[in-house]
From Swiss-Prot:
Organism: Oryza sativa subsp. japonica (Rice)
PANTHER family hit by this protein: DOLICHYL-DIPHOSPHOOLIGOSACCHARIDE--PROTEIN GLYCOSYLTRANSFERASE 48 KDA SUBUNIT (PTHR10830:SF0)
Family: Belongs to the DDOST 48 kDa subunit family.
Protein name according to UniProt: Dolichyl-diphosphooligosaccharide--protein glycosyltransferase 48 kDa subunit
Topological domains, Cytoplasmic: 438-439
Length: 439
């Protein structure tokens, strides 16, 4: 009977170690590593293997499923099974299992991330998901982006739908600090971004000479999408910091485009490798929060010269405020360095607005005097910067007036009133004395 006991004990210890190890692995990063990859053809797994290998090499656990799998589900027993979604199924008319457009949008609303790639065969389902994320693909189902000037030289005899794009967003947070030198190959459909929507950004835009139309037919009317208004790849960061990348080209992520050389039409410079591999690697790092993710910890406030946080301040108190902000580097949390983080001392409107100074070790701090107004105030930090997750910090604190025994015994500004009072009493005494005793 001893052997079974030892066997059960060893199994229990192994399971405990597995749980502890998994918890330790998840504790460090801002996001989990479970990613569902939906494809409409399992051949995509091999034709886009370099991109998937890049994700797996960075520690992501990919679960490949056909988009119409009848057992497909994003959650079970109220818990999501995945932390991210790669949707490489542009032609699928409906998803299998319990997955539909609403469940994917709920997945994003729950704070999860998604990469969506479409092409000229994009179904209404894929177009609908993209629309809900803030971008509108060309309504013409036969349309593709055409550029008779900025096309790849290998497409010289073709219909000029193989675009060599180099109009990239200027953001080291989204695209990395190393500049993408080579043009990015793109063949697919364009989309429009509402300029009033501050949550969506164009990452790769078409050139002014591009337009969206059916390459197999002559133009009967002016195209609805033209020039730089056409976005080839866009990203969206929701208010809950969920991130979405939408590409009008599935080929953008393919092995063929990632490993292909590129030469722009009319240019003498030939690049041995297109910018696709660097582009999709860097943008996927941003989408899955390997870069540009901030966290704030240890929010503190206290009176100057003290360390304990009071439950209430008095008007005109001198106080100190500090917060620690860190940025995820992909492997660890590093101190965030910036000179534009501000704190508000807020009641209906900001009474105090101060820029926080940093020690470049992650600590941001400032000091100020409590305004001569009592009520319920808030320390507020609202930090929104391009490419970074937003920080919204709020801490409530009441401010009271002076108590009766806390005022100065004699107020300097009241001396004229003191003099007036005593002079009035003196004059009345003299008047009374003269009136009573003078004959």
């Amino acid at each position: 009977m001893a052997a079974p006991r030892h066997h059960h004990l060893a199994l229990a210890v192994a399971l405990a170690l597995l749980v502890v190890t998994a918890a330790a692995a998840d504790e460090g990063g801002p996001r989990g590593r479970r990613v569902l990859v939906l494809v409409d053809d399992l051949a995509v797994r091999s034709s886009h293997s370099a991109f998937f290998a890049s994700l797996q090499g960075r520690g992501f656990d990919l679960d490949f499923r056909l988009a119409d799998d009848p057992k497909l589900s994003l959650h079970r027993y109220g818990q999501y099974l995945y932390d991210g979604l790669v949707l490489f199924a542009p032609s699928t008319p409906r998803f299998g299992g319990s997955v539909d457009q609403n469940s994917i949008l709920e997945f994003i609303d729950a704070g999860h991330d998604m990469i969506l790639a479409a092409d000229s065969s994009a179904s209404d389902l894929i177009r609908g998901i993209a629309t809900e994320c803030g971008v509108d693909f060309d309504e013409d189902p036969e349309a593709m982006v055409i550029d008779h000037i900025n096309y790849a030289a290998t497409d010289a005899e073709g219909d000029h739908t193989l675009i060599a794009g180099d109009d990239l967003i200027q953001s080291d947070v989204i695209l990395g600090s190393k500049k993408i030198e080579a043009p990015v190959l793109f063949r697919g459909i364009g989309h429009a971004v509402n300029p009033s929507n501050s949550l969506v950004l164009k990452v790769l835009s078409a050139s002014p000479s591009a337009y969206s139309a059916n390459p197999k037919s002559k133009l009967a009317s002016p195209p609805s999408l033209t020039g730089s208004a056409i976005s080839l790849v866009s990203v969206m960061q929701a208010r809950n910091n969920a991130r979405v990348l939408i590409s009008g080209s599935l080929d953008l992520f393919s092995n063929r485009f990632l490993k292909s050389g590129v030469q722009k039409a009319g240019s003498k410079i030939r690049h041995e490798k297109a910018g696709n591999e660097q582009f999709v690697t860097e943008t996927s790092k941003w989408v899955f929060h390997e870069r540009g993710h901030l966290k704030a910890v240890n929010v503190k406030h206290n009176k100057v010269g003290e360390t304990n946080e009071p439950g209430m301040y008095r008007i005109n108190d001198d106080l100190e405020y500090s917060v620690e902000i860190y940025e995820w580097s992909g492997t660890s949390w590093k101190p965030y360095v910036a000179d534009d983080v501000q704190v508000q001392f807020y009641m209906m409107s900001p009474y105090v607005l101060k820029t926080l100074s940093t020690d470049k070790k992650g600590v941001f701090s400032t000091s100020f005097k409590v305004p001569d107004v009592y009520g319920v105030f808030q320390f507020k930090v609202e930090y929104q910067r391009l490419g970074y997750t937003g920080l919204s910090l709020s801490k409530q604190i009441p401010v009271r007036p002076y108590r009766h025994n806390e005022y100065e015994r004699f107020i300097t500004s009241a001396y004229p009133y003191y003099a007036a009072s005593f002079s009035t009493m003196g004059a009345f005494f003299i008047f009374s004395f003269v009136y009573l005793y003078h004959k």
